[in-house]
């Protein structure tokens, strides 16, 4: 992958491929290929596809702990094999869970760069509001190194994701934090894939 700067892999998806191989061997293979191509990695943990082995260790109502445990486990393996060019992301469609997961991870491994995002945030303006809540709370505490805004918009309108991200970051930098506004939590929560 010499022309690719960074590749994301999802720890939860590793269990569905080559089931006879332990996940550690799969990660070592990914890291080897990345090192050969001078490519960084992102350990992309997503609420919808958490490592099944980790999920079994926690109560069903606790979705954050298995995400954080999976990210810590994969980070430790990459450290152990000497692969240091990696970041971590912990994404959920609920901004409160994104905040909790990233705070928990950052408190344990503050030296690892974090990529922030709210997955399947939905349509604007709600998708922007959800993302803003997470980014404002985390970035204002020094948590987060890169960001992605995921909105359900047609491909020709994907520029809205970049515009929203820039506006949120500019507002945070200028001290214009808006997340004191209560985001509705008692009505329907529309969750949708950014490309669907």
Language-model features and meaning:
Residues 5-12, 40-47, 114-116:
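Non-cysteine beta-strand/loop elements that form the S-adenosyl-L-methionine
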Residues 31, 46, 55-196:
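Catalytic alpha/beta core domains of metabolic enzymes, predominantly
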């Amino acid at each position: 992958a010499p022309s690719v700067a960074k590749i994301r892999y999802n720890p939860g998806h590793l269990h569905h491929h080559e089931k006879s191989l332990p996940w550690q061997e799969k990660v070592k293979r990914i890291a080897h290929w990345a090192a050969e191509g001078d490519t960084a990695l992102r350990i992309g943990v997503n609420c919808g596809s958490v490592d099944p082995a980790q999920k079994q260790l926690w109560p069903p109502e606790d979705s954050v702990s298995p995400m954080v445990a999976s990210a810590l486990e994969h980070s430790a393996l990459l450290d152990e094999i000497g692969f240091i060019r990696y970041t971590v992301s912990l994404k959920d469609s609920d901004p409160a869970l994104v905040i909790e997961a990233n705070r928990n991870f950052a408190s344990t491994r503050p030296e690892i760069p974090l990529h922030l995002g709210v997955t399947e945030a939905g349509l604007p303006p709600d998708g922007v509001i959800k993302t803003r809540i997470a980014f404002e709370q985390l970035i204002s505490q020094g948590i987060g190194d890169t960001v992605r805004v995921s909105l359900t918009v047609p491909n020709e309108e994907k520029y809205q994701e970049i515009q929203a991200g820039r506006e949120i970051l500019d507002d945070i930098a200028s001290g214009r934090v808006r997340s004191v506004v209560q985001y509705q939590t008692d009505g329907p929560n529309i969750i949708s894939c950014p490309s669907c």
